[in-house]
């Protein structure tokens, strides 16, 4: 990032003239910590006249002077730096021009911190705001304006560093007031969304490190709309607007992780449109994710992890099961991609989540971030249950093996109807899309296995867990029952058209 500050000193020009700063900290800026828990803050620039001068830098940590250095200007150029430490304290920088015993303030930056930087992006569930999101912290930061699809205009470019928010001051109307509108298409300065704000809160409280989150989500966006088009960064695209903000924040090479919640808009089998925008075709998702991941790693050089949320049954078209399975496969393909389920999260309305539900996103993903970036060792299992094998264990018996102990919810009652767990598995004879229903006599969970007793001698080739989005033969959105982790109570990852081994 190169910001230019022209400082005209209102004293006789024979002493001072004009100084240009090409590097200087800004108010509320977060500097990314290095492996030693430090960051270097640099002032550099040049002076336009020929009078010899001295500069003095003063650094205050929580208002206590901790560093002071005088520097001579040589050949009209100067550079001076100071090391700051990561932690829950704030720095103030004051740069002075010195002539004799007199000091003249050139630049001041308040509330500067050192910590970690993350990105959240995707479609609407990546950036939902809520009037209930009132938490604010001096150590939770963001940069610029979350704009969605709107052009990043000149006024937006004036918005620099500030305190992150999960709220939306410009949102209004009955749906907003009652919690059914998350400000999906509103511009929000320093907006990080409900669960982004909750994640920042949990990280700050647990690890005592400041956090910056930049959210680039766009409501209803396809994976294509999150990709880098064209090859150069453009403010006309979601990718470009996000990359611009990250670059201007000086974080391009220091993003630790990207959290990606997206896929509902890619559940179509052929060309379709929503509000005039092209929808995504599910069969292209895996290849497109490969491209997106490569572009992220090319633009954000320091990227270490990608946290991918498997989508919940909800808004979208008829191939949600396929997208969820593709997301499973993506997580297995890449060592630096971690997947998290959204099953068994409360408050799903058929497309989005309640305030409480979004907070659960942050609660689930926190232990993974703590493990990956803070070296936390956890005796508990912190990942969602994932199927590792399905096989015939008897003539009329199929065993499903998971990577951890699980338990089953027996049923979910909706509108007076009990939807039984045993009816949420679907089978196929020829490995086409599983659609054979109600062939299970009983289910039993035992440690990390589910034992399925069939009521037929028919041999099946594959099975799926949970329907595409509706309960079978209804228009009621699926809300459970769920397979959940026995110890962590995290909903299992769904699976689709998985081969049943003999």
Give, region by region, the residue ranges found by the protein language model:
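Bacterial Sec-dependent N-terminal signal peptides
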Residues: 1-20
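Cell-envelope and extracellular/periplasmic
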Residues: 18-502
């Amino acid at each position: 990032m190169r910001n230019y500050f022209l400082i005209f000193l209102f004293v006789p020009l024979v002493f001072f003239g004009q100084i240009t700063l090409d590097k200087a900290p800004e108010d509320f800026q977060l500097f990314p910590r290095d492996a030693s828990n430090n960051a270097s803050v640099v002032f550099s620039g040049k002076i336009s006249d020929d009078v010899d001068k001295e500069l003095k830098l003063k650094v205050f940590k929580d208002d206590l002077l901790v560093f002071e250095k005088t520097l001579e200007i040589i050949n009209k150029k100067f550079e001076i730096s100071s090391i700051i430490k990561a932690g829950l304290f704030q720095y103030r920088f004051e740069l002075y021009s010195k002539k004799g015993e007199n000091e003249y303030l050139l630049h001041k930056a308040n509330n500067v911190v050192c910590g970690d930087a993350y990105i959240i992006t995707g479609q609407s569930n990546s950036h939902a705001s809520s009037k209930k999101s009132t938490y604010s912290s001096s150590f939770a930061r963001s940069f610029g304006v979350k704009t969605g699809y709107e052009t990043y205009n000149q006024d937006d470019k004036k918005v620099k560093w500030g305190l992150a928010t999960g709220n939306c001051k410009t949102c209004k109307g009955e749906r907003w007031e009652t919690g059914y509108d998350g400000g999906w298409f509103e511009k929000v300065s320093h907006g990080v969304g409900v669960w982004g704000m909750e994640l920042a809160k949990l990280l700050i409280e647990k690890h005592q490190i400041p956090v910056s989150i930049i959210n680039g989500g766009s409501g209803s966006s396809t994976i294509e709309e999150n990709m880098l088009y064209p090859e150069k960064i453009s403010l006309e695209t979601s990718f470009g607007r996000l990359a611009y903000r990250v670059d201007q924040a000086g974080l391009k090479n220091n993003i630790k992780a990207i959290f990606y919640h997206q896929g509902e808009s890619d559940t179509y089998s052929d060309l379709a449109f929503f509000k005039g925008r092209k929808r995504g075709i599910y069969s292209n998702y895996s290849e497109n994710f490969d491209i997106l991941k490569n572009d992220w790693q090319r633009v954000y050089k320091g990227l270490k992890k990608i946290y991918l949320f498997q989508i919940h049954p909800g808004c979208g078209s008829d191939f949600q099961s396929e997208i969820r399975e593709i997301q499973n496969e993506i997580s297995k393909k890449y060592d630096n991609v971690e997947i998290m389920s959204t099953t068994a999260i409360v408050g799903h309305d058929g497309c989005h989540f309640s305030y409480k539900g979004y907070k659960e996103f942050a609660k689930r993903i926190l232990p993974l971030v703590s493990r990956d970036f803070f070296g936390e060792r956890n005796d508990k299992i912190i990942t969602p249950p994932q199927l590792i094998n399905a096989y015939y264990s008897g003539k009329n018996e199929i065993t499903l093996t998971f990577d951890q102990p699980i338990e089953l919810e027996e049923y979910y009652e909706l509108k007076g109807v009990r939807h039984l767990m045993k009816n949420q598995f679907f089978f196929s004879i020829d490995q086409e899309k599983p659609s054979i229903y109600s062939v299970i006599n009983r289910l039993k969970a035992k440690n990390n296995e589910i034992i399925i007793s069939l009521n037929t001698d028919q041999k099946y080739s594959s099975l799926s867990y949970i329907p595409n989005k509706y309960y079978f033969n209804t228009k009621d959105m699926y809300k459970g029952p769920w397979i959940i982790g026995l110890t962590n109570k995290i909903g299992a990852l769904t699976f689709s058209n998985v081969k049943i081994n003999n």
